[in-house]
Amino acid sequence: MTHPVPIQFQSPDLEAIASSAGRIVVFAGEGGAMGVAAKRVNRLMRGALERAAASEAFGKLKQGEAMELGFPAGMAADAVQLVKLDRRCDVATARKAGGAIGRSLSKAGTLVLADTIQRAAEVSFGIALRAYDFTPHKTGEKTVPGPVTMMVANPETVAAEAGPMAALAEGIFFTRDLVNEPANVLSTFDFAARLAAMHELGLEVEILEEEDMEKLGMRALLGVGQGSEHPSKLVVMQWKGGPEDQVPLALVGKGVVFDTGGISIKPAAGMEDMTMDMGGAAVVAGVMRTLAMRKARANVVGLVGIVENMPDGNAQRPGDVVRSMKGDTIEVINTDAEGRLVLADVLWYAQERFNPRGVIDLATLTGAIIVALGHENTGVFSNDDAFCAAFLKAAQSEGEGAWRMPMGERYDEMLKSRIADMRNSTGREAGSITAAHFLRRFVKPETPWIHLDIAGTALLKGDTALAPKGATGWGVLSLDRLIRDMLEK
């Protein structure tokens, strides 16, 4: 898998700055305020840095943005990057500043002169996240950034703060790698194998095969994958880092490794992006990896239904009726509304087996949520106000966009079927809401539940402050924060 770039922390050495090759990064706040190390660079550059910080171009920069000064006189470095950042900044701005650095690391090495910036660990986290580069399928010489060193006033303290963030970066990168992989590489077999390998980190991993799910009555999930040559699987990952009597939190993910739409086949244009339809399962996997790597003091179980939705002579048809593990029957109106069928059985299994304190499911579930919220926010649905508020607070603190969507009985009535207990698709109107109501039917009344529709946030066509175009890893940060707040305090 792709690993974050390692970052070393050391005390400031002003005499070493002039001879440092590669790229030098310095910070200046509003009005051009600079620390000791930046002032040293300014002297070496004969005032050029101060003039840049006083320029109109620098004045127009927002906090966390940067400008370049190429081939600085008086220094061995190839370039100096001037980042606009106040010494006392918030977490999101510090990460954004790190992202500006991470997008342009030098092959010859990068020296970050953080001085006394209070959020230096968050800056390093932003560097790591933005430096992500998915290259396993590219041939030829690959550009590998040189060593990254951060000179900071209190290196031991910053290194200790950055430790858990390194585990988070590993989890986010694992999620991004899974979502970015093509379906001919990430089959249901390979996905399950990658998750099983995490037992080396201390996770308990169990794989349920099709015959196991058949015995449990999971015909909703199994029907989705019956047109594929690759068998469906249910992977259960348990992290038991909390007290024995702590009731676990359950995370449930949709893992459709490729979605053609089945017999209700999708248009060809854009179908290549349906390799990301396992994004919910990838986030669950990334969170579980993070918990194991940082030795979280919490009990969490992650469950992912892994299937491939393909059309062939054995594929599920529009009009079929399937029986879920719960016992409810479902009329399949549209085979391209398959994710909710997968989640229905996994949600019920999670509650029956683990009786969790709460369940959070994640899925690239509907295009309707993109129409409603674009690519800035994940749609949040819940049956429990307090649980939902805790999640929204966690998402806001981590800078991940999330917006609560409405639910109501009139939407639930739209699921009525003429021949079964419910139907899996209701048409275009309120598509993300009716999908959430479908899932809610497989949540016990006493179970706090959150549904996260990440169709608009799991993969993006353009760069962001903390990720290149492609998979974002949205959700790992928010869920890890929620687990810290709920289970580890």
Curated annotation (Swiss-Prot):
Its main location: cytoplasm. CDD domains: Peptidase_M17 (cd00433). It catalyses: Release of an N-terminal amino acid, Xaa-|-Yaa-, in which Xaa is preferably Leu, but may be other amino acids including Pro although not Arg or Lys, and Yaa may be Pro. Amino acid amides and methyl esters are also readily hydrolyzed, but rates on arylamides are exceedingly low; Release of an N-terminal amino acid, preferentially leucine, but not glutamic or aspartic acids. Pfam families: Peptidase_M17. Its EC number is 3.4.11.1, 3.4.11.10. Its cofactor is Mn(2+). It is found in: Cytoplasm. Mn(2+) 2 binds at K254, D259, D277, E338. GO terms for biological process: proteolysis. The active site is at K266, R340. Binds 2 manganese ions per subunit. The keyword Electron transport does not apply. GO terms for cellular component: cytoplasm. One of its GO terms (molecular function) is metalloaminopeptidase activity. It is an enzyme of class 3 (hydrolase). Signal peptide: none annotated. Keywords: Aminopeptidase, Cytoplasm, Hydrolase, Manganese, Metal-binding, Protease. Mn(2+) 1 binds at D259, D336, E338. Belongs to the peptidase M17 family. Presumably involved in the processing and regular turnover of intracellular proteins. Catalyzes the removal of unsubstituted N-terminal amino acids from various peptides. This is Probable cytosol aminopeptidase. The gene is pepA.
